[in-house]
Amino acid sequence: MGYYLVTGVAGFIGWRVGEFLLKEGKAVLGVDNLNDAYDVTLKYWRLNELKKSENFKFYQIDITNFQALKTIFETYSISAVIHLAARAGVRASLENPWVYVDSNITGTLNLLELMKDFGVKKLVLASTSSIYAGQSPPFHEDLKVDTPLSPYAATKKGAELLSYTYHHLYGLDISVVRYFTVYGPAGRPDMSIFRFIKWIYEEKPIKIFGDGTQARDFTYIDDIARGTIASLKPLGYEIINLGGGKNPISINQIIEILERLIGKKAKREYLNFHKADVKVTWADISKAKKLLNWEPEISIEEGLKRTVNWSKENIELIKSIKV
C-alpha cells in the first residue's frame, strides 16, 4: 500500500486532512519542519492527535532541503502528494519575504522534481484566495490574477505556475485548490478567529485592522479537508476554489456571534486597514461542485459553535499559546 505524503502535516489543514485520510484507512506519511511562524505548542498538539494512528508516520523535514526530501521518496512508495507546507500570512510576508520564496517556491519546486524523478503522478497543491486581491467578487478561477498585493500571494501564484509547467512537461496530474479563510478547532493562532476567542476569554482588546466591515468567505476546516481529498481524483491540471460560496460575513459580525457563544462581550480596538489586505473574499464554487461534487456542509454559525466548544474543552491550551 502506498503512502499519501502530506507536507505541512502539523499545520491546521495538514492535520485535518491527515485525520480524514487515516479514518478512510489510508497510510499517511507526514512531513513538517515545525517552524515557529506561530506558537509550536499547537503543532505538537495536532501531531499527537495524528500519532494515535498506527498508519501515520512523521518526519521533521524542511521541504527546502532537497536531499532530506529525496530520502523520503527513496524510502517509501508514495501514491500521491498533498502539498500543504507553506509560509502563510499576508502581513507577515512583508516582514520577511525571503522565507516565503524559499518555502513556497523552492519547496514546491523540490517536490515537483522528486515527483518527476520517482514517478509520483498526483499532486494536490494548496493555494490561496489572497491571489484574487483587486478583483471583483465573487471570485472565479478564470480571473486574471497577475497583480498580487503581497509577497505571500506572489509566491503562491509562483507555485501555481511552476506546477503547471511540470504538468505540461512531464504529465503530472495537478489539482490546485485555492482556500478561502479556513477556521475551526485547533486553528492557526495567527488567524482572526483563534485570536478573537482567546482575547475575549482573557478580556483583552480585539485588534481589528480597519472598521470591521471587511468581509471574508469563512470556510470550516472539515469542509476544506473533504474538498482537498476529493481533489486527489485525476483531473489533468485544474485550479479549484474551496470556499463558503455564500455571502461573505464581516469581521464585526463574527465578533458578535463569538460574544454570544462565549457569553462575554469583546473589547474592540480598531486600527488602520493594512494596504496588503483585501476588503472582501468570496468564492465562486461552481467548479468544485461540477468537478468534485463538493460544496460546504457546515454553516458559519455551526462552525463557530464547534470551534468555541473545542476552545472550552482546551481552555488551558488556548491560554498557553502566544499570539
From Swiss-Prot:
Q: Which InterPro entries does the entry mention?
A: NAD(P)-bd_dom, NAD(P)-bd_dom_sf
Q: Which Gene3D superfamilies match?
A: NAD(P)-binding Rossmann-like Domain
**Record's keyword terms, sorted:** Isomerase, NAD
Reaction catalyzed: UDP-alpha-D-glucuronate = UDP-alpha-D-galacturonate
Ligand binding (NAD(+)): 11-13, 156
Q: Does the keyword Endoplasmic reticulum apply?
A: no
Q: Which cofactor does it need?
A: NAD(+)
- Name the Enzyme Commission number(s) assigned to this protein: 5.1.3.6
List of catalytic residues: 152
Q: Name one GO molecular function term.
A: UDP-glucuronate 4-epimerase activity
| PANTHER family, per the entry | EPIMERASE-RELATED (PTHR43574)
Q: What does this protein do?
A: Catalyzes the interconversion of UDP-D-glucuronic acid (UDP-GlcA) and UDP-D-galacturonic acid (UDP-GalA).
Q: What does the sequence similarity comment in the record state about its family?
A: Belongs to the NAD(P)-dependent epimerase/dehydratase family.
| Name the record gives this protein | UDP-glucuronate 4-epimerase
What is the scientific name of the source organism? Thermodesulfobacterium geofontis (strain OPF15)
